[in-house]
Design a protein with these regions (language model features):
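Short amphipathic coiled-coil heptad-repeat segments
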Residues: 1-18, 192-228
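A short beta-sheet element
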Residues: 39, 49, 55-56, 67-139, ...
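Specificity-determining recognition surfaces
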Residues: 42-45, 52, 137-167, 245
Length: 275
């Protein structure tokens, strides 16, 4: 990547690409912008197998969270065929507190369906889906989504507002693809590191349980276990302190109490604290 001062050209860029990026409305780059609906009967129609049914909780930052995935029958899916989503669709939460969360549909083996809280953004073939998914995940993309929200509560996006989102994009498909794949590799690496972190956290939790129950004990350099633990009251291992944080001639410091905010000097006048 190299630096450039040219207008509408990114500061960092992969070598081999030239020319300015163009600002385009998202609606001009897509073949579909639309959402789904909840089946008649709601959750009573959810099953443990069938067609994956995506809800807002399945849309995370850049990827699908399938831990809480539900399914619908083929018959219901046929009734809702207009809200089917396919591999490579950009999915965007458009209502509620999770508005703006974005993911790429990564379900390869079949299509999925979705409810009315999630919007399908399906790019034309000449535009690389993950470039635009990553753009919506960026700070600039999130800000545009926030500013586009409708209503006094600012917790809703309609299709017109989504279609009118203006995005700077490379004119060459290969550059879009290069950028999208670059971020995909970073996301994969992050996911691996998160899995490692989760394993370490589970390991720590297990060690804490075993060590503090003395099920697991350490040995000294000679291979002998350290002496047994002693049971003490907390006050026996703490040091009393009457120190205050300010001098009398400095600005007063308030502290919270059951009576509300009072001077720290009054609160600790006849009290002891632990250090």
């Amino acid at each position: 990547m190299s630096n450039t001062q040219t207008k509408n050209v990114p500061e960092l860029r992969f070598p081999g690409f030239e020319g300015e990026w163009e600002e385009k409305k998202l609606g001009n780059l897509t073949t579909k912008i639309g959402s789904g609906k909840t089946p008649k009967g709601g959750s009573e129609n959810y099953t443990n197998k069938g067609i994956p049914f995506l809800r807002s909780q399945n849309i995370r930052n850049g990827k699908l969270n399938l831990n809480d995935l539900v399914y619908i029958s083929k018959d219901i899916d046929d009734e809702m065929k207009n809200s089917r989503t396919y591999y490579g669709d950009v999915l965007l939460n458009i209502t509620g507190a999770s508005i703006g969360r974005t993911a790429i549909n990564s379900i390869v083996e079949t299509h999925a369906n979705l409810n009315q809280h999630v919007c399908i953004i399906r790019l034309k073939k000449e535009y690389y889906y993950n470039f635009f998914g990553q753009y919506l995940l960026s700070r600039k993309g999130k800000r545009k989504i926030f500013l586009a929200q409708s209503g006094g509560s600012r917790e809703g996006l309609n299709f017109k507002e989504i279609a009118n989102l203006k995005i700077f994009t490379p004119t060459i498909f290969e550059e879009q693809q290069k950028i999208g794949q670059f971020f995909s590799k970073l996301d994969q690496q992050i996911e691996l590191e998160e899995q490692k972190l989760e394993l370490l956290q589970q390991q720590k939790k297990c060690y804490i349980q075993k060590i503090f129950s003395q099920e697991l004990r350490f040995k000294d350099e000679e291979g002998n276990y350290y002496k047994g633990w002693n049971k003490k009251q907390l006050k026996d291992v703490l040091e009393f302190s009457n120190k205050r944080t300010i001098n009398e001639n400095e600005y007063p410091v308030l502290t919270s109490s059951r009576q509300g905010l009072i001077l720290q000097s009054d609160y600790y006048k006849d009290r002891k604290t632990f250090a």
